[in-house]
Amino acid sequence: MDVTAKYELIGLMAYPIRHSLSPEMQNKALEKAGLPFTYMAFEVDNDSFPGAIEGLKALKMRGTGISMPNKQLACEYVDELTPAAKLVGAINTIVNDDGYLRGYNTDGTGHIRAIKESGFDIKGKTMVLLGAGGASTAIGAQGAIEGLKEIKLFNRRDEFFDKALAFAQRVNENTDCVVTVTDLADQQAFAEALASADILTNGTKVGMKPLENESLVNDISLLHPGLLVTECVYNPHMTKLLQQAQQAGCKTIDGYGMLLWQGAEQFTLWTGKDFPLEYVKQVMGFGA
């Protein structure tokens, strides 16, 4: 790819950043489509995020992806949020139109799309959702919008717990889905929730390097063959949770599905063009 002065810059702002496959995926897609953009990763944490957004404007970047730990903070730095992003309270995509910043969240649509592409119908189903960060709440919000009957959200009593309660209130007030929030330390409640669940989704970083030997499911007997287990983590590809799920006879969806479909939507938001899906799946080695 020969980058010229006509090329526009798209970024990814996250910390840590070196594990991300998004730059490789998006640049392969941009090159295949013959579009004058290049995608670069920038190591940005909460402290440096405000300055990074000023830099985005000053450099007239087309936009940026947003990942941990900036997804919720980023909402404060855009001029407009989509209705779904407001419900989530977090964004993973910024589009810059001549200095006017719009915030989107493609994590939820991407993950739910991956579930649907597997042939699973979420309407009327119950999901156990692990975590209350940006990706997790995006999945919950989109699932509620698209027909989940109930979401049982489990999170530790950390800085995200109050945010989880606020998220549940927003979803309960604006959709027909019922959301409850429980401390993950309550293992009896967790076991009871899994027993009646149709879907278990890990929206946390547990399982991602360097936590690849960890899982929030401490007892594999809690997983039953009728359960669909889905991951947001894609590095490593086969997390400990997915290994447990396969041993228990569950159907699984790895983190590549969400990465692919959320990235496809981002690509279109930034470029106005269709994402070369089949090509990217092939060159990236995704089985999604």
Swiss-Prot record:
Pathway where this protein functions: Metabolic intermediate biosynthesis; chorismate biosynthesis; chorismate from D-erythrose 4-phosphate and phosphoenolpyruvate: step 4/7
Residue numbers binding substrate: K71, D107
Keyword NAD appears in the UniProt entry: yes
One of the GO BP terms on file: aromatic amino acid family biosynthetic process
Residues involved in NAD(+) binding: A132, G133, G134, A135, N155, R156, R157, D158, K205, C232, V233, Y234, N235, G255
Transmembrane segments: none
UniProt keyword Amino-acid biosynthesis present: yes
GO molecular function, one term: shikimate 3-dehydrogenase (NAD+) activity
CDD domains xrefs: NAD_bind_Shikimate_DH (cd01065)
EC numbers: 1.1.1.282
Pfam families registered for this protein in UniProt: SDH_C, Shikimate_dh_N
UniProt-listed Gene3D superfamilies: Leucine Dehydrogenase, chain A, domain 1, NAD(P)-binding Rossmann-like Domain
Coiled-coil intervals: none
Catalytic reaction list: L-quinate + NAD(+) = 3-dehydroquinate + NADH + H(+); L-quinate + NADP(+) = 3-dehydroquinate + NADPH + H(+); shikimate + NADP(+) = 3-dehydroshikimate + NADPH + H(+); shikimate + NAD(+) = 3-dehydroshikimate + NADH + H(+)
Superkingdom, taxonomy of origin: Bacteria
SS bonds (residue pairs): none
Keyword list, A-Z: Amino-acid biosynthesis, Aromatic amino acid biosynthesis, NAD, NADP, Oxidoreductase
Function: The actual biological function of YdiB remains unclear, nor is it known whether 3-dehydroshikimate or quinate represents the natural substrate. Catalyzes the reversible NAD-dependent reduction of both 3-dehydroshikimate (DHSA) and 3-dehydroquinate to yield shikimate (SA) and quinate, respectively. It can use both NAD or NADP for catalysis, however it has higher catalytic efficiency with NAD.
Quaternary organization: Homodimer.
Family of this protein: Belongs to the shikimate dehydrogenase family.
NCBIfam families documented for this protein: PRK12749.1 (NF009390)
Stated name of the protein: Quinate/shikimate dehydrogenase
